[in-house]
Amino acid sequence: ARYRVGGGHLDLRIEDDQQPWAPPLDGQMRVSSLQTGLFAGPLGSDIGQHGVHPAARVREEWKNQRLYTPHYGVIEMRAKATADADCMVALWMIGYEEVPERSGEICVAEIFGRDVSPESAAVGMGVHPFDDPTLHEDFTQVRVEIDVRRFHTYTVEWTPEHVAFFIDGHLQRSLDQSPDYPMQLMLNIYEFPADRPEPATARPKHFVVDYVRGYRPDGVPTSHLRGSAAAAD
């Protein structure tokens, strides 16, 4: 990932000399992602996390890591999104996927710059099952009348019974389903290739984050709950 830390904030960036992350699979898409876990199979295998393409294979061997993989709790982010039409910023929670079926995703917040105006924005939130047969697709964009280019809080409450989504402490939606396994966090900024010679705005592109916090519910063991974020470019 490309990032800087200063003034008490994390600045997750897409920079001018940054190469596309996987040209054979995603063309010219660039991404910076901080994640709190890493799991993959042997070199050349198709075993890995958050599969983006059926042709994806393990190209580099890395040590598997669990830095912060909570199982239920509250996750909260305070951040500024971007109005850049070529970009998307997000905080996702995904299954660690040491078992393929443990692959569901909780999307805490996902914001495309093309959906941002000074008066309002569409904020994506919900659950994607992927290969988890116990979950069903329930994802939507909620239009909120705030300027997401300023700091706001995006929160998910994750219990055995439900997943609830909040913006600035206000409930947006609640789902009666819940992944029942540890999940890692994925903090991302994407720059999508555009049908024009130059990007919509000059690089670097920015996703400024004040904090990401996790709260453990009473009675839950502390194993796999402490650590710091891992970076992937």
Predicted regions mapped to residue ranges:
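GH16 jelly-roll
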Residues: 1-233
